[in-house]
Every structure is written in C-alpha cells, then in structure tokens.
C-alpha cells in the first residue's frame, strides 16, 4: 500500500509528487497516457501569472500569490527554462481604463507587490511596438514565463529520484473504499491501494471526482489555438502582453517564450471533451 496516490502526471501532479517525496512517504503517480505532460501541461501559454486577477479572498487568489515565488524557486532547482519578464495588461479607451484600475485594486487586496499603472506613453517607452491606441496599462513585475512541459518532466524525474513510482497507461476507472484507504483500478485491470488520493487529473478532474463519489463540480472544456513564431520574432516584446480580461478568460496574449520564440493566442472554443485537440 502506498501512502499517497496522485492521479494525473501533469505539472500539478508531478510537482505535488516532488513535494511529497521530501518526506518519508511512499508515493505513486498514475497517468492515463504513455508519458507525463501529455495533457494541458504540454499545451498552454507557459505563463507565471502575477496574481492580480483572481477574486480577492478566494483560494485561487491565495495560492496564486504564494505560488509565484515557489514556482521560480522550483525552476531554479530543476534547471528549467524560466524568466521573470513581467507582464502588461493593455487598455484601449476609457471603459478599459477603468478595468485597469479595478485590476490594480484587486492585486493590492491579493497582496501582490511590484504593480504600477502606466499611461499609454509610459507603456510604449517600455514596449516600443505597442499600438498608439493603448491608453493605459497595468505593469506586473513578478509575472514570468516558463517551459511547462520541461517543468513537468523535471519534476517527475526528481520525484522518481526521491522514490516515487510512475505508472503510465493507467486510466482510472474505479475508486473503491478499502481498509485504511482506497483501491484504485485501471482500465486494463491493474490495481493499487493508497491511504490518501490526490486528484490532479486536469481537464478530467471532475470525472475522477465523480468516480470517487465526490461529484461537486463540472469542468466545461475549451480548446485554444496558438501561433508560434520563429525566434527571429522573439524580441518583438519583452513583457507578456494581455488584453483586459473578459468572462471567458484573459483573452489573446502576445508573449516571448522561455525558449526565445514569440507566442500569440490562445483562442477559446468550447469542445465536447478535453481530449479534442483538433485544429481549425
């Protein structure tokens, strides 16, 4: 029997395993794909978000603020490509100017330091390729960029060096209460037992919760498409550039990547399953 079984070997699951293996615990990582970082952890913007956006008082706000320095620390320890380049949220007109003020106030409530509100002229001094139509910007100096799949792979390797076991092609189909813990069954008939379970299943976390008899939320999956430009364009901007956020998310961003490319996107199209990775 393992002390802890972690379902999902994405960036959250592998970093959780890495942290738990600092202690005298037996840890098992269960992944339904044939390797780590095969879900959202290999297909995202690679942004270390500054923490100004979450609703103050929520768990997300608390963990974002605490998580930023921890993520930079993990990147240094694991030698993962990462840069504290800062971010800017741009406003175009009076209505969006007011949103910038709201985001700044929200960031202050969340305990985020190193923020500043810039005029359009001040923003263009930092980023010469910004549009003349930019009227105001929120500068967030603690934000950054990281290679998410490199982080996931490195965290998994470190956890395994510390004694964690990784079991791939392990699609969880049943979770049964057992004596002193849980029995976790896979589609191909394998089983493990663990005293505690941690659900890190990403886009499938609601399905795992339902299997465990703890259905209290639903994930509505969205797929995003990006344009990845050549490294010759990587210095077009130095900060991660956001629009003001909407109800659907942070919108289209423009950012250098940790590997020196320029990334544009993502879109946010609703799909019927997190496994739908078709492009249009």
Describe each region flagged by the PLM.
Residues 56-65, 90-99, 138-157, 167, ...:
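Short beta-strand to alpha-helix junction loop
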Residues 21-43:
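Glycine-rich FAD pyrophosphate-binding loop
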Residues 2-29:
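N-terminal Rossmann-like FAD-binding beta1-loop-alpha1 element of flavoenzymes
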Residues 18-19, 69, 78-83, 199-280:
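Active-site substrate-recognition segment that forms the wall
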């Amino acid at each position: 029997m393992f002390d802890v079984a972690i379902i999902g070997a994405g960036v959250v699951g592998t970093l959780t395993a890495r942290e738990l293996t600092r202690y005298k615990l037996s840890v098992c990582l269960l992944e339904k794909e044939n390797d780590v970082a095969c879900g959202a952890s290999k297909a995202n913007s690679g942004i270390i978000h500054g923490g100004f956006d979450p609703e103050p008082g929520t768990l997300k706000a608390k963990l974002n603020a605490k998580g930023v320095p921890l993520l930079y620390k993990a990147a240094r320890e694991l030698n993962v490509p990462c840069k504290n380049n800062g971010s800017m949220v741009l406003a175009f007109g009076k209505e969006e100017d007011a949103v910038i003020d709201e985001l700044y106030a929200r960031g202050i409530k969340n305990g985020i330091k190193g923020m500043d509100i810039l005029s359009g002229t001040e923003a263009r001094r930092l980023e010469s390729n910004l549009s003349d139509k930019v009227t105001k910007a929120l500068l967030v100096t603690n934000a950054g960029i990281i290679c998410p799949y490199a982080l996931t792979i490195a965290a998994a390797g470190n956890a395994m060096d510390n004694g964690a076991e990784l079991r791939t092609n392990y699609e969880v189909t049943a979770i049964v209460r057992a004596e002193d813990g849980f029995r976790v069954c896979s589609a191909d008939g394998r089983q493990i037992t663990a005293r505690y379970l941690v659900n890190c299943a990403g886009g499938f976390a609601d399905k795992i919760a339902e299997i465990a008899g703890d259905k209290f939320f639903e994930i509505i999956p969205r797929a995003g498409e990006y344009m990845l430009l050549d490294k010759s364009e990587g210095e077009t901007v130095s900060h991660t550039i956001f629009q003001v956020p909407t109800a659907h998310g942070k919108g289209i961003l423009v950012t250098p990547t940790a590997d020196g490319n320029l990334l544009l996107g993502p879109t946010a199209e609703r799909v019927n399953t997190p496994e739908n990775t078709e492009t249009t």
